[in-house]
């Protein structure tokens, strides 16, 4: 019997609208980019599937201005100051066999810088991490979440985001 592995494939869909002088909105970017699922992301997904971790689902989508090439060993956006992570809302989680669609809406006043990089991560607290515990009124320990980036990609045609532009970033993930 041959051992067969099923790859996790993913794409990032970036769709941007720009306000026009007459009040209408025009699509100025509609790109689909193949992403790189990073090593820690693969580990987190497999641990979640195997119920080794109780949490581990994708919770945030982020954008940043770093031009550092995407690599499997990365664990976060590479931008040092211009970046923003947004929480994926329940209504923005859609599964249509065989693809999972996760999206966030970056409004006109959010993330107004050049978007060179896009990423998705789990930002929940792992069951093995420290939790907040009170004995009476004394704080005995403190939670320190350690986000796990699943995938990151650098856009070869970056968006220059301004207050006249609204963007939806959608991650599409599928096995096979």
Predicted features along the sequence, with ranges:
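Small cysteine-rich, disulfide-bonded extracellular modules of the LU/uPAR three-finger superfamily
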Residues: 1-115, 123-176
């Amino acid at each position: 019997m041959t051992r067969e592995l099923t790859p996790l494939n993913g794409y990032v869909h970036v769709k941007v609208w720009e306000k026009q002088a007459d009040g209408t909105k025009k699509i100025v970017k509609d790109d689909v980019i193949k992403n790189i699922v990073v090593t820690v992301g693969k580990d987190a997904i497999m641990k979640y599937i195997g119920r080794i971790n109780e949490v581990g689902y994708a919770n945030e989508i982020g954008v940043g201005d770093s031009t550092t090439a995407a690599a499997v060993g990365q664990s976060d956006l590479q931008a040092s100051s211009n970046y923003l992570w947004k929480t994926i809302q329940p209504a923005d989680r859609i599964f249509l066999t065989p693809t999972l669609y996760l999206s966030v809406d970056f409004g006109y006043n959010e993330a107004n810088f050049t978007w060179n990089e896009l990423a998705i991560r789990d930002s929940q607290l792992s069951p093995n991490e420290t939790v907040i515990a009170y004995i009476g009124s004394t704080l005995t320990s403190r939670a320190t979440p350690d986000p796990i980036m699943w995938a990151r990609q650098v856009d070869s045609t970056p968006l220059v985001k301004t207050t006249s532009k609204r963007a939806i970033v959608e991650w599409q993930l599928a096995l096979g």
